[in-house]
């Protein structure tokens, strides 16, 4: 009988996101063969969707697809990078994406209802919680998409641009994370909040209020440029702004969408040493 070490249990947990006792049991049954343990766990129907529903699904994939003048971006979550690369999970995400494009579905609850049966079956097969998290779409004269691996996806809609330019703009959005298209699009609420922050910083430096306010006015112009697409230095040629690039091509960006896997989801960090200690007390 092979020794089932804590490090072996930890590795299996990291690769499958299964519970510690479940991993230990699988390794015992597989006589310490981690690959066989994974295979047996994936074949087992004991891992049910109901048991995984409360687990945080913060990994996964971003998918994009363009169909003529219509494009969709989708996020489907799982719990680990291991499952995010699984063929069955990828096929499920692709199927959801195709349905969203074909039906022009932008209500994620509609997609969830349509694919709930398949989702539950996949959870039981793979052993992780899976969630169709969000979907959005763009329509435009010229559309471009870019995917940085499977974790970041971007759609860009433009006028007067060719496909190559829109592709480069999508790559820029992926890298530089703008929040708005143009400086004038930055909401009054965002501007007011940043103004107060910058004014407080300026006042703390000992400047009189009148001088501090003038300093902040200059900083605010810089701020709105930094958070807007057209105000940012173009990643492929930082000597010019995206706005200048568009002007050179007599083009305009009407909208963009950027998704990154797990944005806004708080991952639960597990203290492995504490969990080992707890498990040893139970045995």
UniProtKB/Swiss-Prot annotation:
One of its GO terms (molecular function) is translation elongation factor activity. CDD domains: UBA_EF-Ts. Its main location: cytoplasm. Keywords: Cytoplasm, Elongation factor, Protein biosynthesis. Residues 80-83 are annotated as: Involved in Mg(2+) ion dislocation from EF-Tu. The keyword Protein biosynthesis applies. InterPro entries: EF-Ts_dimer_sf, Transl_elong_EFTs/EF1B, Transl_elong_EFTs/EF1B_dimer, Transl_elong_Ts_CS, UBA-like_sf. Gene3D superfamilies: 1.10.286.20, DNA helicase RuvA subunit, C-terminal domain, Elongation factor Ts, dimerisation domain. Pfam families: EF_TS. It is found in: Cytoplasm. One of its GO terms (cellular component) is cytoplasm. It comes from the Bacteria. Belongs to the EF-Ts family. Associates with the EF-Tu.GDP complex and induces the exchange of GDP to GTP. It remains bound to the aminoacyl-tRNA.EF-Tu.GTP complex up to the GTP hydrolysis stage on the ribosome. This is Elongation factor Ts. It comes from Pectobacterium atrosepticum (strain SCRI 1043 / ATCC BAA-672). The lineage of its organism: Bacteria, Pseudomonadati, Pseudomonadota, Gammaproteobacteria, Enterobacterales.
């Amino acid at each position: 009988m092979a020794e089932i070490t804590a490090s072996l249990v930890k590795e299996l947990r990291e690769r499958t996101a299964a519970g510690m006792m479940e991993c230990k049991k699988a390794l015992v049954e597989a006589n310490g063969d981690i690959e066989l343990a994974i295979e047996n766990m994936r074949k087992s129907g004991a891992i049910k969707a109901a048991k995984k529903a409360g687990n945080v699904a913060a990994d996964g994939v971003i998918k994009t697809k363009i169909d003529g003048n219509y494009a969709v971006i989708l996020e489907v979550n799982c719990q680990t990078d291991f499952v995010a690369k699984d063929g069955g999970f990828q096929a499920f995400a692709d199927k959801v994406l195709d349905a969203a494009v074909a039906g022009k579905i932008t209500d994620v609850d509609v997609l969830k209802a349509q694919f709930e049966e398949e989702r539950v079956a996949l959870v039981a097969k793979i052993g992780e919680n899976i969630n169709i998290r969000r979907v959005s779409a763009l329509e435009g004269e010229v559309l471009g998409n870019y995917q940085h691996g499977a974790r970041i996806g971007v759609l860009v809609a433009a006028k007067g641009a060719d496909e190559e330019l829109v592709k480069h703009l999508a790559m820029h959005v992926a890298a530089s994370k703008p929040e708005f298209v143009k400086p004038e699009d930055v909401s009054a609420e965002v501007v007011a909040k940043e103004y107060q922050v910058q004014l407080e910083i300026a006042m703390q430096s000992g400047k009189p209020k009148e001088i501090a306010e003038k300093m902040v006015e200059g900083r605010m112009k810089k701020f709105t440029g930094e958070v807007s697409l057209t105000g940012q230095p173009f990643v492929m040629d930082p000597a010019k702004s995206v706005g200048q690039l568009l002007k050179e091509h007599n083009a305009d960006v009407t909208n963009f969408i950027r998704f990154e896997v797990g944005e806004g989801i708080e991952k639960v960090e597990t203290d492995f040493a504490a969990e080992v200690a707890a498990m040893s007390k139970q045995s």
